[in-house]
Amino acid sequence: MKNLLTIAGSDCSGGAGIQADLKTFAAHGTFGMSVIVSVVAENTARVIDIQDVTPDMIKKQMDAVFEDIFPDAVKIGMLSTPEGMQAVAEKLTEYKPQNVVVDPVMYAKNGCALMQPYAIDTLIKTIIPLADVLTPNIPEAEKITGMEIKTVADMEAAAKKICAMGCKGIVVKGGHHIGNAVDVLFDGNEFYHFETERINTKNTHGTGCTFSSAIAANLANGLSVAEAVKNAKSYVTKAIEYSLAIGKGCGPTHHFVDLYRKAGMLE
């Protein structure tokens, strides 16, 4: 069994953040570990408050994991402050893990900022160069590049521009576009397009976390970047198709569809 680490924020409602990451790791037959960088008081409808963990505690959590159970892949999610980013970058540079997948989370599903605006420069300088795969959505890619992204060609141009910042590969997620959901992967050499029909549901809380964690799990399990992204796209699409209509806002995806089917708990 492969060991995976998520470095991200905690979502007490269970739909996103480390909770979504750990569910995704388990669904892919891997052992999940977590380093919490922020505690987020949120639910399906709103973000109430955010409490950031100190950089020193972030580093101690990372030391605790890496000195004992070295991860086969690392997923990085919400990093809200420059100081937190620098702490994570310092330890990743020290331990040099493989298969680092970075989801540059900037906003919650309801639009609440999860990354301080002045932290984007630090993200570009310290975190992006450590990524084997970066997974921004269109608004995040626009913030990183300063571009306006309206077409698939724009997504490709943004992917190239961000890849030049030091990451080895990038998936620009097209879920914010009208029409089918098209994701553009640039692996540093060539482009791949992954397209699925858009599912008409509001219950998409945690989809970005789930997608990036699935990529990390697939890489740890030995798949190529292109196959890892393809399989992650299929996994998250099914999770959205069977999403859970719970809460008063945007409900979460269903991370264990296949497991529930095999157990006879879901038709």
What are these regions (language model features)?
Residues 14-30:
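N-terminal basic/disordered segments at the start of proteins
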Residues 19, 142-143, 201-225:
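Short, small-residue alpha-helix embedded
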Residues 7-13, 191-205:
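Short pre-catalytic strand/loop immediately N-terminal to key active-site residues, enriched for Gly-Thr
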Residues 2-6, 26-109:
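Conserved N-terminal subdomain of the carbohydrate kinase-like
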Residues 52, 226-267:
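Charged C-terminal helix
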Residues 29-33, 191-192, 218-232:
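Phosphate-handling active-site elements
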Residues 117-191:
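Conserved phosphate/ATP/ADP-binding segment of small-molecule kinases
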